[in-house]
Amino acid sequence: MRLFRLELKRILKSRRTLILLAIALLLSVAMAYLPISFEGINRPNEDGTVTELDGLAAIKYKQDLYKTSAGEVTPDRIKSALETYQSCVREYGPVEEEGFPLAVFIEKIVPFRHLLMGLSEAFADPLTGIGADLMDIDPNDIDGAYYEKCAEHLQDVMRNEQRENETAQQKALEKYSELDTPFYLHSGISKDAFDYIELYILFLAILCVAIAAPTFAGEYQTGGDSILRTTKYGHKQLAITKILAAFTLFVVTFLVGITVHILILDAAFGTDCLKTSFQMRYSIINLPNINLGQLQIILAAAGLLSVLATVSCMLFLSAKCKDTLTVLLISIVVLLMPLFAYVAMGAT
């Protein structure tokens, strides 16, 4: 235990380590602020003027608007929202055009638009998968059959993408039937907030790799590796101690950083929106039976495992390579390789 404390103290005495840890915590705050700053909305005033709201002011204003649509996503509510949308479009023209009255948009469209997000997808063309225009959907087709329509769309997608794999098609439908319905919606938090959680985890992994790179390779450069090979408490015991000290530091750093990051986001966007079903924020045919709050936990847990896996790979390289720079470069390539592979596979 004393050896463990001394090793941890040795790591923390490094100015380079302290700077990188400070950067990790600063990034936690800065990257949580970015999706908050991206929020914006125009608020019509009684005198006919328009006020541009950004950041927390925009979030607060949107929260007040979204309260009317919060609750279970029932077919009746979706039908009512669609009828309101179609009525407004017939009277004022397409919502996307500049001529659409801002006051009408804020009062009748914004509060309920997230209820309609999955509707176009659910009524998509069964062959092409192209979403239906909301104006082409008959509100009467939604009565009591909305979730059946979602399941039909999933069946169409699986038939198109897994044509040769009937087992996968059946498994997807079985998994979808296990979802808790009706879905729940409390709009507020944006997709950007979750994207930045993932991006922060990536940066955190890079910083942890930079901190841990000299763990063994640095000893080779200074000649300190002779202690590992010749002393009474060297060999396996000292190596394990160095690894445990590094892991402890990274786990604590990750937990503090990701906790601060998520707390800032939840304080800004509110915790009510975390009850929203995963399907109402992403695709209506997503299979995970979770809400956005659980998604945050899953991202954090998966992120921690990813960081520890990356650091484990880096420690192995640090033990094999003779200089820190080589370890650092190879580790970063390994860390970013899944991103490059994803882009390459997506392109093909």
Language model segments and positions:
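Hydrophobic transmembrane alpha-helix segments characteristic of membrane transport
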Residues: 219-226
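Short helix-to-coil transition segments within interhelical loops
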Residues: 229-235
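Aromatic- and glycine-rich beta-strand/loop motifs that create alpha-glucan
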Residues: 1-18
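Residues that define the loop-to-transmembrane-helix transition and helix capping
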Residues: 15-18, 236, 324-325
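Secretory targeting signals
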Residues: 25-89, 94, 138-219, 240-323
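Aromatic-anchored segments of alpha-helical transmembrane domains
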Residues: 28-32, 333-343
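Central hydrophobic cores of alpha-helical transmembrane segments
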Residues: 24, 325-338
